[in-house]
Curated annotation (Swiss-Prot):
Keywords: Cytoplasmic vesicle, Golgi apparatus, Membrane, Protein transport, Transport. This is AP-3 complex subunit mu-1. Belongs to the adaptor complexes medium subunit family. The gene is Ap3m1. It holds the Pfam family Adap_comp_sub.
């Protein structure tokens, strides 16, 4: 299936390549570089590129391109999913999927790629199995390997490889048995000038940290599971149980993993947590304008909205801005024309505002349209969709584990039009 894999940075340098069958020349990447030059943005490079003798299928992750070379027709999503699994494995092993981390651990990278693909076909892609085959890097292990000349490859075959549950290794033991879940939701929204919602959608994930001994069988139920759309499951989930009862039943992997991702697309279910009052005006034949924005919580949810930042891309005719914030601090870059206001947390009793004058180029025409406000925020212990975990039951083991659920709401692409 996959003949070769090239890792390319944003500068266009191929800093790592791996071949599973015959060696493919780096010149095949010229087709990718041509498509990259034509793209308006790095994220707009075509995922699938056809060449006279190959197909190039790529993903863009953490400022790196993972470019695979295919010689026969295969489902592109199959290859894309595998490339994302490779990037996730690097993230899990090294703490980050960056060029520096990959270069620092290049031997382990090649060992991982050798195990993940067998003659070009996916073999071992589950983190639990890979960590039995190839030990994650540590400072002590790196020192020992440099002295003894040994590698991170394990001495024994993984016990889970022949198991019916490939994502969980056998013989897991913990002194403290714990199961924690993070429900993280991002709001993507567009708010018009009058404050009405043009578009709103919630993207959510449930991340799990499972440290349980033995082979536990878990069931996670929700108060209101029907609001979830387009649910994507970890392979451990029993899909028929979800279809019939809307309960997540699974034997979990050991450690950290993403249990599900989901979407809430019904706009009447999406509550917008903040509002913005704005008055941005530019006078005709004048060298100044007015800038006035106030941000506050839209409804009393009993939770504090924190980590608020407002980013505004001002028109090119703006020279400088003289503003006064009632809370936080702001910066304005006269080169990029980007205004950034770091607000912090807000309370209904004291609404933060940013007011002042905008200096324009003399003689320049009035800007045709006002800039948009891009807002970031975070709300702890709240799932904005209203999703709530009802209970977690465990079967197959006799001990009583520690259980916990944490909710976080964040702004995704949250834009206010002025």
């Amino acid at each position: 299936m996959i003949h070769s894999l090239f890792l390319i940075n944003c500068s266009g340098d191929i800093f790592l390549e791996k071949h599973w069958k015959s060696v493919v020349s780096q010149s095949v990447c010229d087709y990718f570089f041509e498509a990259q030059e034509k793209a308006a943005d790095v994220e707009n490079v075509p995922t699938v590129i056809s060449t006279p003798h190959h197909y190039l299928i790529s993903i863009y992750r953490d400022k790196l391109f993972f470019v695979s070379v295919i010689q026969t027709e295969v489902p592109p999503l199959f290859v894309i999913e595998f490339l994302h699994r490779v990037a996730d494995t690097f993230q899990d092993y090294f703490g980050e999927c960056s060029e520096a981390a990959i270069k620092d651990n290049v031997v382990i990278v090649y060992e991982l790629l050798e195990e993940m693909l067998d003659n070009g076909f996916p073999l071992a892609t589950e983190s639990n199995i890979l960590k039995e085959l190839i030990k994650p890097p540590t400072i002590l292990r790196s020192v020992v390997n440099s002295i003894t000349g040994s590698s991170n490859v394990g001495d024994t075959l993984p016990t889970g490889q022949l198991s019916n549950i490939p994502w969980r290794r056998a013989g897991v033991k913990y002194t403290n048995n714990e199961a924690y879940f993070d429900v993280v939701e991002e709001i993507d929204a567009i708010i018009d000038k009058s404050g009405s919602t043009v578009f709103a959608e919630i993207q959510g994930v449930i991340d799990a940290c499972i440290k349980l001994s033995g082979m536990p069988d878990l069931s996670l139920s929700f108060m209101n599971p029907r609001l979830l759309d387009d649910v994507s499951f970890h392979p451990c989930i029993r899909f028929k149980r979800w279809e019939s009862e809307r309960v997540l039943s699974f034997i979990p992997p050991d450690g950290n993993f993403r249990l599900i991702s989901y979407r809430v697309s019904s706009q009447n279910l999406v509550a917008i947590p903040v509002y913005v009052k704005h008055n941005i005006s530019f006078k005709e034949n004048s060298s100044c304008g007015r800038f006035d924005i106030t941000i506050g919580p839209k409804q009393n949810m009993g939770k504090t909205i924190e980590g608020i930042t407002v980013t505004v891309h001002m028109p090119k005719v703006v020279l400088n801005m003289n503003l006064t914030p009632t809370q936080g601090s702001y910066t304005f870059d006269p080169v990029t024309k980007v205004l950034a206001w770091d607000v912090g947390k807000i309370t209904p009793q004291k609404l933060p505002s940013l007011k002042g004058l905008v200096n324009l180029q003399s003689g320049a025409p009035k800007p045709e349209e006002n800039p948009n406000l891009n807002i970031q925020f975070k709300i702890q212990q709240l799932a904005i969709s209203g999703l709530k975990v009802n209970r977690l039951d465990m079967y197959g083991e006799k001990y009583k584990p520690f259980k916990g659920v944490k909710y976080i709401t964040k702004a995704g692409k949250f834009q206010v039009r002025t």
